[in-house]
Amino acid sequence: MIHQSMTSNLSFYISSVSHLSSPLPSLSRLSLRCCSSLPAHDMETKPSQGLYPLHRCKTIHLVRHAQGIHNVEGEKNHKAYLSEDLFDAHLTPLGWQQVDNLHKHVNASGISNRIELVVVSPLLRTLQTAVGTFGGEGYKDGVNTPLLMTAGAGNSDRPAISRLNRPPFIAVESCREHLVCLLFYLLHDWHFLEMKTFAMFLVQGVHPCDRRSNITKYRELFPAIDFSLIETDEDVLWKPDIREEDKDIATRGVKFFNWLSTRKEKEIAVVTHSGFLYQTLNSFGNDCDPSVKNEISKKFVNCELRSFVLVDKCMSSSDPPMTNYPGTILTGEDASSDIADQK
């Protein structure tokens, strides 16, 4: 269902979750920039662009984590996702190469100099991707600056990473990966599930690779990342027998975007997961041309970055316009020409 907060003949921005029975109450606040889906004969009379005040817009750079060990093992055999050996999966050597390439890209394109905040999901693979991509070039002896990552953190052979001249990093639970039920594997490959393991189906419902480590451990490995928004040291959100439904992921994602819109920063990087991105971004683009909808919501590959404009269409943003100029209200005889023009 498409939200009708704008006039019916405008379709610049998205405010619905297509697979839900009714619109999310909070979704109408936000939009991702896209084109109109107007018929060709209407293009000359109806605008195909969106026009919003600049101070109500943010640029967000969405990044999926680089290749993790769970990605490799899962490609070989889907059953591997159920292995405790993949608990809080770390990056592979190829994953770190992907991070190095993305690091070069954000520096060469100027993105790294514009970003004011890096938001990251508190799992090892996303933390490693975030600091490797948006962190400093490396720690140097004698430079008194906090470390984004200690040397060798997370079974890596990487040197320490400095936060020198880098933006703040903050970990947020609400952009974590979704929980996946074993039913997926039951449908994907029925024969692997023997009757003796059927009882496990009732209690073992999600991937251990999506369960995070304690925050105490993360603070030791990533000293300069702010974990203050995470309320519990242990992972109380991951459940061994509960599957988060797609619509719930979308709702969580929309709430996360709402939170982004309240931040003072105007350009933000978010390092997160493919499932979270797919379900959240699928909430947008339903009144766009199909090619634009696909550009918004298609699945991310490892270490992919896409940039969007996030628009707050309500009055939730309190930031004043920084580039507007009020002009001068004329009085007396000088006002006559303006008054005449308004009649």
UniProtKB/Swiss-Prot annotation:
Family matches, as CDD domains: HP_PGM_like (cd07067)
Keywords: Chloroplast, Plastid, Transit peptide
Cellular compartments per GO CC: chloroplast
Protein location: Plastid, Chloroplast
Main localization (coarse): plastid
Residue segments, region Disordered: 322-343
InterPro entries the UniProt entry points to: His_Pase_superF_clade-1 (IPR013078), His_PPase_superfam (IPR029033), PGM_Phosphatase (IPR050275)
Active site: 65, 177
Function as written in the Swiss-Prot or TrEMBL entry: May play a role in carbohydrates metabolism.
Family: Belongs to the phosphoglycerate mutase family.
Protein name: Phosphoglycerate mutase-like protein 2
Species of provenance: Arabidopsis thaliana (Mouse-ear cress)
